[in-house]
Structures are given as structure tokens and as C-alpha cells.
From Swiss-Prot:
Isoform 1 interacts with HM13. Isoform 1 interacts with RNF139; the interaction induces ubiquitination and degradation of isoform 1. Isoform 1 interacts (via luminal domain) with DERL1; the interaction obviates the need for ectodomain shedding prior HM13/SPP-mediated XBP1 isoform 1 cleavage. Isoform 1 interacts with isoform 2; the interaction sequesters isoform 2 from the nucleus and enhances isoform 2 degradation in the cytoplasm. Isoform 1 interacts with HDAC3 and AKT1; the interactions occur in endothelial cell (EC) under disturbed flow. Isoform 1 interacts with the oncoprotein FOS. Residues 35-56 are annotated as: Disordered. Induction: Isoform 2 is up-regulated during adipocyte differentiation. Isoform 2 is up-regulated upon refeeding after a fasting period in liver and in ob/ob mice (obese) (at protein level). Induced by chemical activators of the unfolded protein response (UPR) such as tunicamycin, DTT and thapsigargin. Up-regulated after partial hepatectomy during the acute phase response. Isoform 1 and isoform 2 are up-regulated by interleukin-4 in B cells in a STAT6-dependent manner. Isoform 1 and isoform 2 are up-regulated during lactation and by the lactogenic hormone prolactin. It is found in: Endoplasmic reticulum. Keywords: Acetylation, Activator, Angiogenesis, Apoptosis, Autophagy, Cleavage on pair of basic residues, Cytoplasm, Developmental protein, Differentiation, DNA-binding, Endoplasmic reticulum, Lipid biosynthesis, Lipid metabolism, Membrane, Myogenesis, Nucleus, Phosphoprotein, Protein transport, Signal-anchor, Stress response, Transcription, Transcription regulation, Transmembrane, Transmembrane helix, Transport, Ubl conjugation, Unfolded protein response. Residues 63-126 form the bZIP domain. GO terms for cellular component: cytoplasm; cytosol; endoplasmic reticulum; endoplasmic reticulum membrane; nucleus; RNA polymerase II transcription regulator complex. Functions as a transcription factor during endoplasmic reticulum stress by regulating the unfolded protein response (UPR). Required for cardiac myogenesis and hepatogenesis during embryonic development and the development of secretory tissues such as exocrine pancreas and salivary gland. Involved in differentiation of B lymphocytes to plasma cells and production of immunoglobulins. Modulates the cellular response to ER stress in a PIK3R-dependent manner. Binds to the cis-acting X box present in the promoter regions of major histocompatibility complex class II genes. The chain crosses the membrane at residues 181-198. One of its GO terms (biological process) is cellular response to oxidative stress. This is X-box-binding protein 1. Residues 230-256 are annotated as: Necessary for the translational pausing of its own mRNA.
Length: 267
């Protein structure tokens, strides 16, 4: 016997279940048969999918329903485990990528810190060469880390003006090199003067000490030599002159005078 359940209204075009109770199937079960309604057939013909309601399991025994429920629960649990495993592997990969990126950023941050320190030292050296006052540590840009972010503290307006005027200062330094050397000369000139004064004082003290030791000895030697020469000197005796007169053997004044002048007494 065939029982046909018609749709209660035209708006609901859901299929109905027909039970064939004339010939029982093997195992004493009734076979369900799904028959589409008029609108469902039209929708299938048009190609648009139609939402199906949940199938009633009135033809299954309680044991079969429990077995089916167990199978569905197993499938759902396995699906959930697979999804969880895939999600965990994805999160682990993201953690590894983030750790690598964090390590790279830390290295880059360290390099930037070293570069900033080198630039600050170079800036101070340039300011010292130009004769300008060095920047205070508070005016130097600093990198402050707060939490996971990094914030750059800008310097004062003086540092910005210095960066803008750097080319002009380089040109001035090239055009006037003595101005750059002037501070160094001011620092080196007193040192040179002090070194010269100390050398002159040392030289004078050394020469005085040398002459104080040598001069008395030379004076003694000179005095002794003078005394010895005075003792060895022979007193000068004027030549003996004969009186002219008739007692002379001959009267030859010129010849006798020449002989007397050439005569020297023997010692």
C-alpha cells in the first residue's frame, strides 16, 4: 500500500516521504522514497540549488541510530583534531618567522646604535676642530625603547642648524686653514715657551757649574806661570859706554859708536 503525503501549502516545496508497506524489505525495514514537489522540480530544472531539510531516521532502529551517532562523533573528533593540528603547525611556523624577524630587527637596531654613536663622536671631533662648543649629552639624539616599540628622540634646534650649515663650514675650513690651526697653536705655544725656559735655565746652571770648577784651576795655573816667568827673567843692563877723550887710541867717533852699539855683554 502506498501512502502519499501532500504538501500543506504551495510555499513549502519540500519533498515528502512515501512508505511502501505492501512489500516489506529484507530485515523488516521500510524503504524511504524521496519525491520532489512541483516547485522543487522546477528549481532543479532551472539549475538553482535547493536547501534540504534534515532527513528523518524513523526507519532505523535505536542500535543503528546509536552506531551512526558514534561514527559521526568519531569523524567530527578526527576532523577537529586535524584542524587543531593544522592550526598549531601554522601558529608554530608563525612563531618561528616572528622570532627570526625579531632577531634581525635586534641586529639592525644594534648596528644603528653603533652607527649613531660613531656619528656623535665624529660630530664632537668636528665641532672641536671648528672651535665650537661640544654638544651636551642631553642634546644628542637618543633611542629609547618602550615595550615592543622604539621611539627616536629628536635633538635640539642647534643640531639641526649645524647640519644645515655643515657645507658652509666645510667651505670656510677649506678657504681659511689657519683658523683651524689657531686653537692648536694657542694650546701648544705655552708648552713650547715653558720648554724653552726650562732648557735655558738648565743650560745656564750647567755652564756656571762647569766654569766654577774650571776657573779657579786656570787662575792658579796662570798665576804660577807668571811667577815662574818673573823669576826666570834676567835684568836688563845697559851697555858700557866709554868716555871720549885723548886717552882713546884713535879718534873715530862714527866707527867706535857703531862698535859700541853692536856690543852686548856676555852673561
Amino acid at each position: 500500500m502506498v501512502v502519499v503525503a501532500a504538501a500543506p501549502s504551495a510555499a513549502t516545496a519540500a519533498p515528502k516521504v512515501l512508505l511502501l508497506s505492501g512489500q516489506p524489505a529484507s530485515g523488516g525495514r521500510a524503504l524511504p522514497l524521496m519525491v520532489p514537489g512541483p516547485r522543487a522540480a522546477g528549481s532543479e530544472a532551472s539549475g538553482t540549488p535547493q536547501a534540504r531539510k534534515r532527513q528523518r531516521l524513523t526507519h532505523l532502529s535505536p542500535e543503528e541510530k546509536a552506531l551512526r551517532r558514534k561514527l559521526k562523533n568519531r569523524v567530527a573528533a578526527q576532523t577537529a583534531r586535524d584542524r587543531k593540528k593544522a592550526r598549531m603547525s601554522e601558529l608554530e611556523q608563525q612563531v618561528v618567522d616572528l622570532e627570526e624577524e625579531n632577531h634581525k630587527l635586534q641586529l639592525e637596531n644594534q648596528l644603528l646604535r653603533e652607527k649613531t654613536h660613531g656619528l656623535v663622536v665624529e660630530n664632537q671631533e668636528l665641532r672641536t676642530r671648528l672651535g665650537m662648543d661640544t654638544l651636551d649629552p642631553d642634546e644628542v639624539p637618543e633611542v629609547e625603547a618602550k615595550g615592543s616599540g622604539v621611539r627616536l628622540v629628536a635633538g635640539s634646534a642647534e643640531s639641526a642648524a649645524l647640519r644645515l650649515c655643515a657645507p658652509l663650514q666645510q667651505v670656510q675650513a677649506q678657504l681659511s686653514p689657519p683658523q683651524n690651526i689657531f686653537p692648536w697653536t694657542l694650546t701648544l705655544l705655552p708648552l713650547q715657551i715653558l720648554s724653552l725656559i726650562s732648557f735655558w735655565a738648565f743650560w745656564t746652571s750647567w755652564t756656571l757649574s762647569c766654569f766654577s770648577n774650571v776657573l779657579p784651576q786656570s787662575l792658579l795655573v796662570w798665576r804660577n806661570s807668571q811667577r815662574s816667568t818673573q823669576k826666570d827673567l834676567v835684568p836688563y843692563q845697559p851697555p858700557f859706554l866709554c868716555q871720549w877723550g885723548p886717552h882713546q887710541p884713535s879718534w873715530k867717533p862714527l866707527m867706535n859708536s857703531f862698535v859700541l852699539t853692536m856690543y852686548t855683554p856676555s852673561l
